[in-house]
Regions:
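Accessory, often C-terminal, charged low-complexity segments
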Residues: 1-138
Length: 138
């Protein structure tokens, strides 16, 4: 029976980043740059891998990570809502409002995840209006 107890201990192995390296020597036209924004994450990495890398970059590995559903989309809640990580596609203004209602201190989105530029700009405004200034896109 004692073998089934989860003590919350995680072991991580140091690996390379989940983000593809950028080749600054190549000249890209505007259309190619726009198309490349969807391919910044390495193919063999999961959203959970990316969530853990975000936690590492923020220095918050001692907080619990849980998967939640917000407005029908899966997000990662770090530290019981301290940070919300949304790596979804088609993020709408309604999705942003639902995340903002959780009152996180920090929010991370996928840069190309917003349904359009208007939704991204409204997200920035919504969080600033609520005093949530730590909003990033990867």
């Amino acid at each position: 029976m004692a073998n089934n107890i989860d003590v919350g201990f995680k072991v991580f192995k140091l690996d390379s980043t989940n983000i593809k390296p950028w080749d600054a020597t190549v000249k890209y036209d505007e259309t190619t740059l726009y198309d490349l924004q969807d391919y910044v994450v390495k193919e063999d990495r999961s959203n959970l891998d990316i969530a853990y890398e975000v936690m590492l970059k923020y220095g918050i590995f001692n907080m619990p990570l849980e998967e939640k559903e917000v407005n029908g989309k899966t997000v990662y809640s770090v530290g019981e809502g301290y940070m919300i990580i949304s790596l979804n596609d088609e993020i709408t203004t309604e999705d942003v409002a639902a995340i903002a209602a959780l009152s996180p201190k920090a929010v991370v989105f996928k840069e190309s995840g917003f349904v359009n530029d208007n939704a991204k700009m409204n997200a920035d405004y919504t969080f600033k209006r609520l005093g949530i200034d730590n909003v990033k896109c990867i």
